[in-house]
Amino acid sequence: MKAGVAQQRSLLELAKLDAELTRIAHRATHLPQRAAYQQVQAEHNAANDRMAALRIAAEDLDGQVSRFESEIDAVRKRGDRDRSLLTSGATDAKQLADLQHELDSLQRRQASLEDALLEVLERREELQAQQTAESRALQALRADLAAAQQALDEALAEIDQARHQHSSQRDMLTATLDPELAGLYERQRAGGGPGAGRLQGHRCGACRIEIGRGELAQISAAAEDEVVRCPECGAILLRLEGFEE
């Protein structure tokens, strides 16, 4: 296969564009803005989980408050009924003693329930303070998350612009190449490595491996427009004297 100096130079430019596109793709998956966003997102999710746990705990305490208040109300009504019976004078001595005993028990029960209710209300107040603090932290994290998302979007937009620019240049450059030469280059790239590299002294510019003397002599003896390949990696070797990358 033959490739004139102009074609070789275009191929070298194509290899440089592909290398830059590879670097752009790597940057897109290793953006510091992405890591920052993921960190804030993790903190935001953790705060959401804490808020959910606090809400569940608050609902449980609210249920306890309702139960205690209901029990206290029932005890109070029972006590009011017993006191009405005591003051009615329509009971005998034994009934009076039983009523008084029940009233004493109800008073102790009411006092115990009210103490328990007070303890739950105190816990509920502490929980409300935690919810308030967590809500403020969550609001701050929402703002941080929005800022991190914007920074990531801007970085991705910049990368997309660079990718589009280099891809457009690549398309235009590929159109100028001999189809057979372009096909060889693409097949080499499909193997996972660079499709072409400049011969730099004794070293292949694609794989950076030094070429043996015997093989280098064969490469040097080939015609200037003869397409030669690296004996190590198979990349097209571009022999371009005086051409700066």
UniProtKB/Swiss-Prot annotation:
<dbReference type="GO" id="GO:0005886">
    <property type="term" value="C:plasma membrane"/>
</dbReference>
<dbReference type="InterPro" id="IPR003743">
    <property type="entry name" value="Zf-RING_7"/>
</dbReference>
<feature type="coiled-coil region">
    <location>
        <begin position="33"/>
        <end position="176"/>
    </location>
</feature>
<dbReference type="GO" id="GO:0009274">
    <property type="term" value="C:peptidoglycan-based cell wall"/>
</dbReference>
<keyword id="KW-0175">Coiled coil</keyword>
<dbReference type="Pfam" id="PF02591">
    <property type="entry name" value="Zn_ribbon_9"/>
</dbReference>
<dbReference type="InterPro" id="IPR052376">
    <property type="entry name" value="Oxidative_Scav/Glycosyltrans"/>
</dbReference>
<dbReference type="Pfam" id="PF24481">
    <property type="entry name" value="CT398_CC"/>
</dbReference>
<dbReference type="InterPro" id="IPR056003">
    <property type="entry name" value="CT398_CC_hairpin"/>
</dbReference>
<protein>
    <recommendedName>
        <fullName>Uncharacterized protein Rv2229c</fullName>
    </recommendedName>
</protein>
